[in-house]
């Protein structure tokens, strides 16, 4: 299947052959299942997710509506591994998302064009880390002026605004550091903070962290769920990244 791409000045991306679809998809999903995120920085996590999603899209398993279905799959998968994401960015920047996937999978040696993940990574930084990179389609056209990533990088949010850090008490900061980029049980967080009195931990640490929007439960409608875990919101991750 071929589709002329505006961002490639009319050229096309090669998709996986239909007879290889199942094998290619199973391979990518198995690789992801066995991948460990432990010890990775958020930048590395985002880069890995971008690469994984780009590979799924390029296999083109969904036929018509492949990009839209890839977006739905991505949202569900990110939620399953602890990220609080929704459809808003995909809806607002659907064309950018598609063009970024095209650029991530396009190679033309004769024209000197190699696959470029940078645009997709900017998209996922906005989605997963709450950053505010400028997402412009015109920057992605092959052989476009070199202002693309330079302009986008200027909006990087490596520093957390002072207002955010001013909200932090010592207990809030300690729970943010204890959770990091993981999904943690209550017991695990208490062990990392070295607290043994559960009511004190819930009253002084967990409840304020949730009320201030730094931490969210995996099962918000069922606080006593047997597999309940907690993870950082985008706001919490911003604080965590600023402390590293």
Where are these regions (language model features)?
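FIC/Doc superfamily catalytic core
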Residues: 1-244
């Amino acid at each position: 299947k071929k589709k002329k791409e505006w961002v490639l000045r009319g050229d096309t991306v090669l998709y996986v052959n239909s007879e290889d679809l199942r094998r290619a998809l199973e391979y990518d999903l198995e690789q992801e299942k066995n991948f460990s995120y432990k010890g990775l920085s958020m930048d590395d996590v985002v880069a890995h997710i971008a690469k994984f999603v780009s590979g799924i899209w390029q296999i083109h398993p969904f036929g018509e509506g492949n990009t839209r279905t890839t977006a739905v799959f991505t949202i569900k998968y990110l939620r399953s591994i602890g990220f609080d994401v929704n459809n808003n960015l995909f809806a607002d920047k659907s064309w950018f998302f598609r063009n970024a996937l095209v650029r991530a999978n396009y190679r033309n040696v004769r024209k000197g064009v190699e696959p470029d993940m940078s645009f997709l990574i900017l998209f996922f930084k906005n989605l997963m880390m709450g950053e505010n990179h400028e997402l412009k389609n015109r920057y992605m056209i092959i052989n476009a002026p070199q202002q693309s990533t330079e302009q986008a990088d200027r909006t990087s949010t490596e520093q957390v605004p002072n207002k955010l850090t001013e909200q932090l008490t010592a207990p809030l900061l300690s729970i943010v550091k204890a959770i990091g980029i993981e999904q943690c049980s209550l017991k695990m967080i208490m062990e990392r903070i070295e607290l043994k009195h559960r009511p004190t931990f819930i009253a002084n640490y967990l409840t304020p962290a949730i009320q201030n929007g730094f931490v969210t439960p995996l099962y918000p409608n069922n606080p006593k769920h047997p597999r309940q875990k907690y993870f950082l919101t985008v706001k919490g991750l911003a604080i965590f990244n600023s402390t590293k």
